[in-house]
Amino acid sequence: MCIRDRTYRLPDDGDTRERAVCNACHTIHYENPLNVVGTIPVWGDKVLLCKRNIEPRFGKWTLPAGFMELGETVAEGAARETREEAGAEFEMGELFSLMNVTRVGQVHFFYRARLTSEHFDPGHETQEARLFAEHEVPWDELAFRTVKETLRRYFEDAHAGQFQMHHVDIE
């Protein structure tokens, strides 16, 4: 694969950003952000969290989420990840948060979701799927800052009685 021997430089095509350029065939390889998609599944006043059975952050709690696949929309990916990780039955809601994580080249999207059952069948990436009231959330054991920020905003909106879309830049 030619990308193994690459140099980051301005391509000869007038581009204004440095790109990965193959030293052998001069092909420009565009490296773009990855989308992480998930949900905030809710049963009454409780949210569903998944305890990770994979790295990174093995054993930490997270919302059901993962990388978007080719051929699916953001919402389809979020629904798929929720089924795969939590084995949850739910109805998709509106987009709740969009978080730019430029440090790692990712954009995280979380949708609200209403659980239609409190029974879960987690997949192999999840040790345990469990419902938490706000005061029970293991805040210091959350896997990712985007999850913590999304949950914090979710509970703030729930207390206010009105949900809004949140756009956040995380350094």
Residue ranges and their predicted role:
Residues 7-11, 31-32:
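Short, non-ligating residues that shape and space the ligands of small metal-coordination modules
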Residues 6, 27-28, 59, 109, ...:
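Intrinsically disordered, low-complexity segments enriched in small/polar residues
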Residues 17-62, 90, 94:
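N-terminal strand-loop-strand
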Residues 1-5:
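Conserved small/polar residues in nucleotide/adenosyl-binding loops
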Residues 68-91, 95-153, 157, 161-163, ...:
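Unchanged
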